[in-house]
Swiss-Prot record:
Record GO terms (molecular function): ATP binding; tRNA binding; tRNA-uridine 2-sulfurtransferase activity
Location of region: Interaction with target base in tRNA: 102-104
Localization of this protein: Cytoplasm
Region Interaction with tRNA: start-end pairs: 155-157, 317-318
Record-listed ATP binding positions: 16-23, 42, 132
Protein name: tRNA-specific 2-thiouridylase MnmA
SUPFAM superfamilies hit by this protein: Adenine nucleotide alpha hydrolases-like
GO biological process terms on file: tRNA wobble position uridine thiolation
Name of the coding gene: mnmA
Paired cysteines (S-S): 107-205
Major place of residence: cytoplasm
Catalytic activity: S-sulfanyl-L-cysteinyl-[protein] + uridine(34) in tRNA + AH2 + ATP = 2-thiouridine(34) in tRNA + L-cysteinyl-[protein] + A + AMP + diphosphate + H(+)
UniProt GO cellular component terms: cytoplasm
Family: Belongs to the MnmA/TRMU family.
Length: 372
């Protein structure tokens, strides 16, 4: 492998070591670039069962093994209280209100790039922090810093980082954002890092491998109600609207209906007032399609957002193809977004993230859907 000429001698970077391959290679690449690198392992959740405890202990063990191999220090910090207050309680409140939140986005905002950065600054005297996220930063000649999509389009994580401020991006380094995932694994293998073939973590960190509905039932009591067709026919019952999201197909328990065709059933709407789950047949059912949406709680990475009436692109969920759209501000905190073509399963509570080419501009929370 070609060595990288050190260019940043003396600058101190604290790398968020998760025990995975991406953070492992991030630490290695930054050392190659001449940074003074130390690791920091975050504990964000107090495990409530043996399996979760074992997984967290395994991650810490792997992070320590990588740091030992690289010859760098590994610090540990417990952010479980901050996570509970700023991420988990928000997650529960949104589900209780019938929306579908994205706790990973809130975790990045409140923990990985806020609590972590503050700890790295105040306790470890960092110049920068670094994470194993697949995004890039661009430093412009006018002194501004922008966040760009990762080179690996399949792994790009800018959707999860749109809440970062200009200042947070300027203090953060994203070495693996310049690489494809297979290159990251190759570097890890070549360097003899224990994480080179470790499976990527999936799902919400505090749920782990458990079934989502079982986990949610621990914190939110079931609220059974009817399942209806758009015409009002009752065809089943649900245990709680919070267990279902728009576009969901599995786990409805209503197959083989009389007088229905063979198309699968999808959740097409939720009637919060009546506690009714509305389902329709086919992935492009009219009730599942939106021509636009309103978006609030806006956040722009470079503080000034796109101009009124501009035509850019948006993602309404992770790994979605960009959707061309036109933006209109209804006030400084709310956008009306009209899609060029109707989009399926746009979900209130999820994030809408806007792009101008490679640049992630920022985004907000999907509030209301526009249909027809």
């Amino acid at each position: 492998m070609t060595s990288i000429e050190p260019t940043h001698t003396g600058k101190k970077v604290i790398v968020g070591m998760s025990g995975g391959v991406d953070s492992s290679v991030s630490a290695y690449l930054l050392m190659q670039q001449g940074y003074q690198v130390e690791g920091l392992f975050m504990k964000n959740w107090e495990e409530d069962d043996n399996n979760e405890y074992c997984a967290a202990a395994e991650d810490l063990k792997d992070a320590q093994a990588v740091c030992d191999k690289l010859g760098i220090k590994l610090h540990t910090v417990n952010f479980a209280a901050e996570y509970w207050d700023n991420v988990f309680e928000y997650f529960l409140a949104e589900y209780k209100a019938g929306r579908t939140p994205n706790p990973d986005i809130m975790c990045n905002k409140e923990i990985k790039f806020k609590a972590f950065l503050e700890f790295a600054d105040e306790i470890l005297d960092a110049d920068y922090i670094a994470m194993g996220h697949y995004v890039r930063r661009r430093d412009n000649s006018d002194g501004s810093t922008q966040m760009l999509r990762g080179v690996d389009g399949n792994k790009d994580q800018s959707y999860f980082l749109y809440t970062l401020s200009h200042e947070q991006v300027a203090r953060s380094l994203f070495p693996v954002g310049e690489l494809e995932k297979h290159q990251v694994r190759e570097i890890a293998k070549e360097m003899g890092l224990i994480t080179h073939d470790k499976k990527d973590s999936t799902g919400i960190c505090f749920i782990g491998e458990r079934k989502f509905t079982e986990f949610l039932r621990t914190y939110l009591p079931a609220q059974p109600g009817n399942i209806e067709t758009p015409e009002g026919e009752v065809i089943g019952t649900h245990q709680g609207l919070m267990y279902h999201t728009l576009g969901q197909r599995k786990g409805l328990g209503i197959g083989g209906m009389k007088n229905s065709n063979d198309d699968p059933w999808y959740v097409v709407d939720k009637d919060l007032e009546r506690n009714v789950l509305i389902v329709g047949q086919g992935g492009h059912h009219p009730r599942l399609m939106s021509t636009g949406m309103t978006v609030n709680q806006l956040h722009w990475v470079d503080r000034t957002g796109p101009v009124d009436g501009c035509h850019i692109t948006v993602k309404t969920r992770y790994r979605q193809q960009d959707v061309p759209c036109t933006l209109t501000y209804t006030d400084e905190h709310t956008l009306r977004v009209v899609f060029d073509e109707p989009v399926a399963a746009v979900t209130p509570g999820q994030s809408a993230v806007f792009y101008d080419g490679e640049v992630c501009l920022g985004g907000g929370i999907i509030d209301q859907l526009i249909r027809g």
